[in-house]
């Protein structure tokens, strides 16, 4: 039975098979996808806009989980984006659920109990469809291979071990954070064959930003890259 559940879950996420639309509620389909992802898929964890965003991936993301923070920086909940065959399938928020068809059209807007949300106009549906689709595309790009990862995957990099991991992490940081150069002090950065951890400086458009980061690597892929700005304003270029 367990194998059957996993197979159905992955089918929903990857487009290998699908349940009839009336066979399971949207929440149940989300749950099946989550069980399958937890059992069989690789994960990625990257920082973006001040939060650490997790994805379960099979090449492309199947589920992306985004923390929701309040104005005081405290965790209030989580939004989850679900993808089926590489297309946005649904979104789950603390107080709402949304379903999309294969053409990218928002077809359901449900409340936290799984019932049709009240007082939702056609214009509201259209606006929410545009916003969620745009947000999903933005999040999906975070988990695309960086130029450094692409080059390493094709065998175009002669570095090995800790040097390769350091190079991959620097490339990923520049791709995600929008910088063009990374510097570091040897005493403040630990480098290993499976990643780096410590302090670096990233050159961005507004100047140099000191960061405390942790980066993990598996083969030519960066599987985790999380960071926090260190105290102090950007240093001039």
Regions found by a protein language model. Give the residues of each.
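Positively charged n-region of N-terminal signal peptides that target proteins for export
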Residues: 1-4
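Short, hydrophobic/aromatic-rich segments at coil-to-beta transitions
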Residues: 39-43, 59-66, 85-90, 192-199
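Periodic aromatic/glycine/histidine/acidic cluster detector
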Residues: 41-45, 49-55, 63-69, 78-79, ...
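Mitochondrial intermembrane space
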Residues: 70-73, 77, 129-237
């Amino acid at each position: 039975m367990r194998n059957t559940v996993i197979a159905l879950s992955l089918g929903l996420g990857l487009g290998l098979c699908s349940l009839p639309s009336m066979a399971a509620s949207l929440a149940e389909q989300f749950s099946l996808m989550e069980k399958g992802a937890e059992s069989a898929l690789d994960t990625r964890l990257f920082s973006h806009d001040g939060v650490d965003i997790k994805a379960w991936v099979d090449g492309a993301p199947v589920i992306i989980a985004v923390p929701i923070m309040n104005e005081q920086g405290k965790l209030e909940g989580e939004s989850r984006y679900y993808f089926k065959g590489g297309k946005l399938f649904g979104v789950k928020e603390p107080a709402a659920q949304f379903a999309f068809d294969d053409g990218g059209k928002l077809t359901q807007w449900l409340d936290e109990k799984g019932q049709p949300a009240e007082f939702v106009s056609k214009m509201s549906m259209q606006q929410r469809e545009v916003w969620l689709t745009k947000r999903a595309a933005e999040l999906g790009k975070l988990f695309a291979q960086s130029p450094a990862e692409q080059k390493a995957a094709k065998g175009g990099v002669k570095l090995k071990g800790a040097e390769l991991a350091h190079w991959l992490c620097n490339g990923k940081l520049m791709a995600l954070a929008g910088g063009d150069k990374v510097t570091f002090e040897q005493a403040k950065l630990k480098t290993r064959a499976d990643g780096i951890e410590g302090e670096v400086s990233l050159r961005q458009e507004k100047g140099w930003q000191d960061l405390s980061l942790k980066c993990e690597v598996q083969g030519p892929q960066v599987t985790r890259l999380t960071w926090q700005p260190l105290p102090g304003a950007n240093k001039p270029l």
